[in-house]
């Protein structure tokens, strides 16, 4: 072939300045593009061999070599694929590849940020000009009597092509790096980028420094293969040591046997795993392989709890592994890693348009060859095929979790504390996932047993039934009352029914802090009542959703009110005088005219005072804090606390009977702070006053 000088395209402007400036933060993708081209060339050559159109040489080993040369400022990508003839270079490099790159840039030039384009596939060979001022191609086709070809381009629209000197089938691409991109000729930087994009490509990839001196290693002679280049055969004679026996005699004992070794040129080690674990059938994978793969990919040396192996061929091809790490920290600060691949080529991390958002708390890899590339994120969001992929992944995760709950409840309970934030977050974010997991949400009760929501409700019903049975022997001797009394009773019953109709939902009591709410827990347990532990910050949103989806239930924190079972059966009228007196006394002592005070006769006489806050009021306070409204008056939303005083307690009786005593204000303040302490931590200022007051009271006792 005579030398040829030509234009890449007569119908296009010079695209190279655009390529050089485009995707500045992602210049390293040229590694992926050029290595992918080499993999494709090797795959095609192997297919030709299978079809009988070409016969591979004995001992043929597909490989891609990358040679870095920081001194010469060059990078070489060498494959032993099918190679190209001059006509093919003309067609594929000068026309098709250039046209494809031009179309790609034209289509996405206004969407060049990483937030817009998925993976940045499409520049292909011409991605080399993102980092190079000049590129050479040397190629020899597999075709019989093919002539090697040499092609050069210096970053303009013109090229030169001539006969080359390559002697083995395949293609070698040489990049002459520009001054801004010399980092890519650094061996460590090159390794980093290759492992980022190409860790699982199907062809072995080898990296070396060009013209570097040979390195050697010594191996046992029996391990030498015909591929090894032996530099020297080494014989290490057996070694003996003198040993003294019990009878005092001495003898020579062999401590290391005679060994034959070979000094060989160090064997190259591929940077990638050509058979990733996700590509295997789940039945062929061991637990240790799953754990090893997890540690390797995610650099996390804490073992995952368990994993899901995705393996689907129809109606789309999708494989992958999702790992469940421990997720018992604040869910809104957790960031997992889901790596998305296309035919074992890395695309990007955490593509939420493909992978359901709640799965971002997990770690895993998903390989989907059918995933559309060269599309914007907005296009993926509206792609029905992509939605099917997302739905499938959600279904498999839900199936795994529900299946574990049904067939291995013990393991499911063991993992629950770690995985519950993920499951609850998934329920909040994905209705379909929530539908599938609704019956497999667990709640840990005060005895550390795990219950489903129906089991929680059954427990509450059992407690209520027990209390009802105890009250069946109440006095019913009212048959001879007059009609007026009957009318009064009927009216009272009607009022009660109306009140029940207002909120007939079944309560599920819960605790957010076992230590802080210990007094309330004790009161519950004394009455054989139960509550569930909801101590994660996702629980507030989660129980709101549960109430929306299950209109017959309501979640009530254990300190929202005192249940009837904790109190003696006393009418309000009997306690009215005590309530009025104590309200006036406490408001005066605490200098708080808005203080809500109530008086009850609690069965536990040791309890002097407790604080209650309605569930609605507390949730409103939580919402105010969440939205930075903490300075607003919570009473605007029914959020005032109520101080409950126990009329059966000796100290409360003392205050009631000695309201004018000089010590009563101190006792009132102390009782109020004690009630607050059992509900929530005191402020630093309030705690200081509480400690000083405690010392004062002890001093009074000492006198």
What kind of feature is each model-predicted range?
Residues 1-185, 192, 199, 215-219, ...:
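GHKL (Bergerat-fold) ATPase N-terminal catalytic module, capturing the glycine-rich phosphate-binding loop
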Residues 117, 135-158, 178-181, 188-703:
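GHKL/Bergerat-fold ATPase module in large chromosome/replication-associated machines
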